[in-house]
């Protein structure tokens, strides 16, 4: 193997375990011809939704075993729906108890996502399309779209025009329409008013809603979902895709035997959660307009849902053909060639043939493989070539792998003493130059904190070497994220059972009710109140919470559910900033430096948040060195959570560390 071949093969890194947010990314490796019957059914459902402005078609259930391509399929659906002038929303159903809160949060998140091929978000697109329908003056339309300063007069003129176009929708949905315009404004105060409205919260300041023509009384989440759907329906069809049902059901420990879902000895908590999920799925069609609901899950999950709700759910959903194996040698070859061609081009390498070193004749055996199994088998061969420093042509695939390995990570390259010194110097230089005030400002936290936290979590994973392979970090969130980062640990690949550590920064310059709104959004997105112990939420804040009754109640519920508030100091921000730049500059030997120096040990808030990680793993890797806990903004120590079952069943959370004195409240 020469140097050019070695470098080219090293670029062939497959990630066969996508996370839900990958649905929003471009699809550079998509190959036409995969799951054609299912895509055809979904697009037919979208056409049906588009043709009926006052109702929604039957929902669709897309079933496939893990690795069959459900997440990739949702990405294809998202792309094609948006190309047909429709809207797409992805609901990560992590908590059946807050079904409508979760659907609403997903719709708001989806509205803040950019439309492919433009810098315009789905929200901006919706407001632009609505503006084109109404007869309001151009100045009012531009203000509502966020292009110019929003005023009450402009908003009133827009609603008058909407009423002329569709009086019923304008009368029913006017408050939500006004909140959408406020959320598109460049003024953060306007956005705070909208955010609190969408959380069904009380007014932050008496009379602030009346100043924009809105009633003071909070509007329930289900009604806001209906409003959003009706407004969207005025301009085009929508798809609401529901994912992560398998992860939720896996917490019930009945995935291995769906018959238990109908058993008389199922616990009341299990039965209640399943009933709430089924009720929400059934009501979604009645609540929405021109909206196709797509439920993506493994077959066992659908069996469990159907058995819980008798025949009622099945009456409102139709099953698509199941996602199958590849069943086509040409399609299998195209899947690999598409990936290899892009990577080889990036490396400046011209292979002997597009699928090199996998012989075209090897794909004759690919019919029995799922797309993920094919990637796993070929990745195994590539790793063996690199390990032996010898290129061997792969001429046969053999049998599909029965066990799924973790997504591969490049082995650490031992850094020389000179390289270690160079990295040490670069790290020190970047720490010194870091911005330690901007990331926690109210106006910039949503933009600055996600990449910083992602860098810290990614470095933490890389420091663990092989023990980090079970972990993943969610891709960058939307521009208006409820969470700033999420670390996932997969406990069971088959059922997709996972543990999540979620993070959200809430700057000290947020006034009390704005901070409260962000706390509530983060709790919904993290599914903190599931009671499973598998969902953890850490709010990063250096100042004490407001002492208002509403905030005290919310913080108390947050803490009782296991949530913690952690301080972030200047040194934490310096380390995160340095790691972000170094990972962007990454070379092959950076992981060697990370594994040796382990800079995330200096992140006090992260060491505290992840103190219980090794209780969930069988191969925990090196134990973290003791560190002082991050300062907490609450004056009193956090209560220690109730004891959990033993690690074999469900690990007990680590005891809360002592907390430092709090900064005074704003």
Residue ranges of predicted features:
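The catalytic "switch" region of P-loop NTPases
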Residues: 1-12, 187-357, 560-589, 593-596
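Extended alpha-helical interface modules used as scaffolds for assembling large macromolecular complexes
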Residues: 312-313, 327-358, 362-369, 373, ...
